Amino acid sequence: LTYSCDLYVNVRIITYIYNQSENHIETKTKKLKDIYIGKLPVMVGSKACILSIIPHENILSECRYDMGGYFIVNGNEKVLINQDRIKENYVLIFKPANNIDIIHTEIRSMNEPLYLPTKTISLSMSKKSNHMGRVIRINTSFLKTEIPVFIMFRALNILSDYEIIHHILYDVNKLKNKHILEELKACCDDAIGVYTREDALEYILRNITGNMRNNKTVENVEMVLDSDLLPHITGRNKKALYLGFMINKAISIYLGYESYDNRDSYINKRIDTPGMLMSNLFRQCYGKITKELKSMIEKDINQWGNDSTSVVDLISDKQHITKYFKQGLLDSWLKYALSTGNWGIKTIGSFQNIKQGVSQVLNRMCHH
């Protein structure tokens, strides 16, 4: 027995049909309502629970002292344990755990209105120095290795050393900023040979992660910079200013003007309650469902070949599109997480992003 509710979605299908003879693109839009995609476990006593709409005195066969707040999965009562996490959209600087760097700056950036996964951007100052001093390099989720920060500035169309330094220091005449300026000389030298935006984009293109190699173009790099580099900030100049702020703060701590952040302090943390935990898990499940949906549609398109009309009719058919949403996938993933406490979806050969012990059996022991 699992206490759950059916989940239906409305699907909007936008089809672009290219007429080669007339060099014209025709757009068709169709809406399909109430497509079943799976079941969602319901928390007892929540707004989705039947008990929430029944007056308390009329509830039958339910203990009047039962406060709810648990899930029923495979006949077992499960509760979710609140989880803490590092807060998003805030620059934090810690003492590095390795012996390679002396400063580690990190921000977990998230576009909150869209509720997309966080993108981690980190800066590191190496213990090793070149002939000019210690360099600062940047790493992100779409790069396979660290790159010089000045190259990232030039990819954001901040080209000259003077412009970059202005984005970092704002006022060069301050005594503190003069000391920071001395530390930036090595960063200028680290980006030697890359002076234009085109060169910077090509440099990033050569260092982009493997899962983006199918779209390895300069245009794709520009799109990635807009969407994955500090996604909570819009506009390349604003992104460059924020990157400059991160560098300024990192060097200020290195020079002793500011102190390190405390990783264990709850000032720098946020708490995920059951609603947020279920939302994050559902987001992962839904992302995997859409990936499988995409691959199945591409398979049908390749199978039907040039018969575009048949493909459009096939995809737009309500009965057929229901087959794209494999029945039981969403149910099994959510039930597995609630049953085992392993929170997250396993990627191929990796449990890296899975938390353990999130779900536990409700203790009904009486202390009287």
Where do the protein language model's features map onto the residues?
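N-terminal non-catalytic structural scaffold regions of very large proteins
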Residues: 1-368
